[in-house]
């Protein structure tokens, strides 16, 4: 992928294929199961809820991205890209678009839940279902009008690339303007993630102090527990890549040779961001009665000791 060196020496390639193939198979299977599972749950959810709209948009983002995963797997298995360079750019860009749109919807969901907690409200929702549809449509129109043309016109267009070798656009990072934009994105994502984590720690500790031993009997706690799923995915899937991205940008800017280990770690961490596709499966699984009962049993067991 995106971190491959474009020189004739392909020594960066073999060490990546096996690891990435396994990861993307997990992403494809887990993502599809999660999409199917959440569809049954969405039928019962309030269609005017802001959180529900964010979840529906997550379904769309994951669904579009999962359509590109089989092409990545085909390239990893065959070792040759046969779908044309323009489509390669689209598939490559979709991994990044998916990551940042998913992060955006996580932020929306968490901010709404935090507002509910601090303002002591039962829910935050649109006045009409039409308003919810209009808000989502406006967001997607913005993505289609701004993001897609930007990707088509700028992504991977500054250098020459081999049409049979895909996801090797790291030379674009040699341009100062591209690196500056990347640094800015990294800083914003890390800062927002840490702020959300701080709020979640504060809320969780407040609830523990308030309810103590009766913590698990309050619905408010279970609502906040779902927040931990999203926070956990941000910490596990997104932040490692963002932190390593800072070092990777520096290496690409100051080195002309292939850095095996740097390219390897960048690709592995980038591919782990796609594991966020399994979030819907965790969301459904975490809301099941069986899981709640197991958590209650474990909590009671800890109190006994």
UniProtKB/Swiss-Prot annotation:
Manganese recorded as keyword: no
Positions of glycan attachment: 5, 9
SUPFAM superfamilies hit by this protein: Family A G protein-coupled receptor-like
Disulfide pattern: none
Sorted UniProt keywords: Cell membrane, G-protein coupled receptor, Glycoprotein, Membrane, Receptor, Transducer, Transmembrane, Transmembrane helix
Places the protein is found: Cell membrane
PANTHER family registered for this protein in UniProt: G-PROTEIN COUPLED RECEPTOR, G-PROTEIN COUPLED RECEPTOR 141-RELATED
Identification of the protein by name: Probable G-protein coupled receptor 141
Organism (species): Mus musculus
Gene name linked to the record: Gpr141
């Amino acid at each position: 992928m995106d971190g491959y060196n474009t020189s004739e020496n392909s020594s960066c390639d073999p060490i990546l294929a096996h690891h990435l193939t396994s990861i993307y198979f997990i992403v494809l299977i887990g993502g599809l199961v999660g999409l199917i599972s959440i569809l049954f749950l969405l039928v019962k959810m309030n269609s005017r809820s802001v959180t529900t709209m964010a979840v529906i948009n997550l379904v769309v983002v994951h669904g579009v991205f999962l359509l590109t995963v089989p092409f990545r797997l085909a390239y990893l298995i065959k070792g040759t890209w046969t779908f044309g360079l323009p489509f390669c750019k689209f598939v490559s860009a979709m991994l990044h678009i998916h990551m940042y749109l998913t992060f955006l919807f996580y932020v929306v969901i968490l901010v709404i839940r935090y507002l509910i907690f601090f303002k002591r409200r039962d829910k935050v929702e649109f006045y009409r279902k039409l308003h919810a549809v209009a808000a989502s449509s406006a967001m997607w129109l913005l993505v289609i009008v701004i993001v897609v043309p930007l990707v088509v016109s700028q992504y991977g267009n500054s250098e020459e690339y081999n049409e049979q070798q895909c996801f090797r656009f790291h030379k674009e990072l040699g341009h100062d303007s591209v690196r500056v934009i990347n640094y800015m994105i990294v800083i914003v994502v890390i800062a927002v993630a840490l702020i959300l984590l701080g709020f979640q720690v504060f809320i969780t500790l407040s609830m523990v102090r308030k309810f103590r031993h009766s913590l698990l009997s309050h619905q408010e706690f279970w609502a906040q527990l779902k927040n931990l799923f999203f926070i956990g995915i941000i910490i596990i899937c997104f932040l490692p890549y963002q932190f390593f991205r800072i070092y990777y940008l520096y290496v690409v800017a100051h080195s002309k040779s292939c850095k095996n280990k740097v390219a390897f770690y960048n690709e592995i961490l980038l591919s782990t961001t796609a594991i966020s596709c399994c979030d819907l499966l965790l969301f459904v699984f975490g809301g099941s009665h069986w899981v709640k009962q197991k958590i209650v049993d474990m909590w009671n067991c800890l109190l006994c000791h």
